């Protein structure tokens, strides 16, 4: 038995200079797992609660000492003596201890950090890599794949201070034969884009996730400049590389309208879907995330109707990694993919349940970071261990993003042909 003998919580810093929760789980025999909770910038209203102290005299109210105290007291007491390999049981103990719908008593940041640390400790106890342990927890032992990265190379919206409304413009190196090759392609495009921006006299500073944030006139301009960079890097757009968007539309949804302040345009629900379709008709956009507000279910039905057969429509704020909400989406034919973020739901077990539900319904699952990250690279192991097929973990700079890519390189080296890179076949509507 992988007996838990100690649980330790502490306050550490995330990539935006805000505090977050880190946890350690110690087992008999000296096995230790350590993990940290990430934090989002654009968040869905139905996400599990990230518990902050609210003490304005410390970190402007963003301290997490209360959540850390919950780890060191209530959670520790509840888990001492338990078996770390029994992940579902551990997570249920913490969920029951919290007793609220959205984990607002203990904090999803506290529960998640311990949940992931326990999984890492259990993997160490079993003498196997974390991705292998996750595959076993998922009921799919030995079934792996390397994910196609969605590389966020140009930022707008909440992730940048510019006139671009769409939050993320991403490249997907679908023409690569291996993850290592895909990463190289993305890096070459990233550096070429920097030169293109510099030569045009545009800013080459980067946003929270490492993408550039130039002040462009429109969203179409952002796509045009990425196209230029892809081709200058020696790749063919639409064959070697496809494009993906994260609109984060809830951030500019006001009074039932989609207000693109940067472009000076206002759309109704169907009008904004038509606008996105027009962009996808001009460029090889194969994936659109949060193309409408999380509450605009009628609009989502229309968007799925006009684009769902050819384009991956990803629900992030829409589904918040929550099986109850995803069930409603599946029943109503809303979207065809779910973004998976650990901290939206707050435990590894619930995260795996959302991935399984999506796959069983024919939806894809895209594993994702948050804008506030740490050096923790658990999502890399999650992507491989569930054979999710896609990962979204930022651009090709900032150590908090590159940590995940580097872990994927290590995993691919270990697994070789046991973890194929399937490229375009992983993306809904493209197989």
Swiss-Prot record:
EC number: 4.2.1.11
GO biological process: glycolytic process
CDD domains the UniProt entry points to: enolase (cd03313)
Gene giving rise to this polypeptide: eno
Subcellular location: Cytoplasm; Secreted; Cell surface
Pfam families found in the cross-reference section: Enolase_C, Enolase_N
Coiled-coil ranges (or none): none
Organism: Shewanella baltica (strain OS155 / ATCC BAA-1091)
Reaction it catalyzes: (2R)-2-phosphoglycerate = phosphoenolpyruvate + H2O
Name by which UniProt lists this protein: Enolase
Quaternary assembly: Component of the RNA degradosome, a multiprotein complex involved in RNA processing and mRNA degradation.
Catalytic residues identified in the record: 209 (proton donor), 341 (proton acceptor)
Any one cellular-component term (Gene Ontology): phosphopyruvate hydratase complex
Annotated pathway: Carbohydrate degradation; glycolysis; pyruvate from D-glyceraldehyde 3-phosphate: step 4/5
């Amino acid at each position: 038995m992988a007996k838990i003998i100690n649980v330790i919580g502490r306050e550490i810093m995330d990539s935006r200079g805000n505090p977050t929760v880190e946890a350690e789980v110690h087992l008999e025999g000296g096995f230790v797992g350590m993990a940290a909770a990430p934090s989002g910038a654009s968040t869905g209203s139905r996400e599990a609660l990230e518990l902050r102290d609210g003490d304005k005299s410390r970190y402007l109210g963003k301290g997490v000492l209360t959540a850390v105290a919950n780890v060191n007291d209530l959670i520790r007491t509840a888990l001492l003596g338990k078996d770390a390999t029994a992940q579902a049981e551990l997570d249920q103990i913490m969920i029951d201890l919290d007793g609220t719908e959205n984990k607002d008593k203990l904090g999803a940041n506290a529960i998640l950090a311990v949940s992931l640390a326990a999984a890492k400790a259990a993997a160490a106890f079993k003498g196997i890599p974390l991705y292998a342990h996750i595959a076993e927890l998922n009921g799919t032992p030995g079934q792996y794949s390397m994910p196609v990265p969605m590389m966020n190379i140009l930022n707008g919206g909440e992730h940048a201070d510019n006139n671009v409304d769409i939050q993320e413009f991403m490249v997907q190196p679908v023409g690569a034969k291996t993850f290592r090759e895909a990463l190289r392609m993305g890096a070459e495009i990233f550096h070429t884009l920097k030169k293109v921006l510099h030569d045009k006299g545009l800013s080459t500073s980067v946003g929270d996730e490492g993408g550039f944030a130039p002040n462009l006139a429109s969203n179409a301009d952002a796509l045009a400049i990425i196209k230029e960079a892809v081709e200058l890097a020696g790749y063919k757009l639409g064959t070697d590389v496809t494009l993906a968007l994260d609109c984060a539309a809830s951030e500019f949804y006001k009074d039932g309208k989609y207000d693109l302040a940067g472009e000076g345009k206002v759309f109704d629900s169907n009008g904004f879907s038509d606008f996105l379709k027009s962009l996808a008709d001009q460029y090889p956009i194969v994936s659109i995330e949060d193309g409408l507000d999380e509450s605009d279910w009628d609009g989502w039905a229309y968007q799925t109707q006009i684009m769902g057969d050819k384009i991956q429509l990803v629900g992030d704020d829409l589904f918040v990694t929550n099986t109850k909400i995803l069930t409603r989406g599946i029943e109503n034919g809303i979207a065809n993919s779910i973004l998976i973020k650990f901290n939206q739901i707050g435990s590894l077990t619930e995260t795996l349940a959302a991935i399984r539900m999506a796959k069983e319904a024919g939806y894809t699952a895209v594993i994702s970071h948050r804008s506030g990250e740490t050096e923790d690279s658990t999502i890399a192991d999650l992507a491989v261990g569930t054979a999710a097929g896609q990962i979204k973990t930022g651009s090709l700079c900032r150590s908090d993003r590159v940590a995940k890519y580097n872990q994927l390189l290590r995993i691919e080296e270990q697994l070789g042909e046991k973890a194929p890179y399937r490229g375009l076949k992983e993306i809904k509507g493209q197989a």
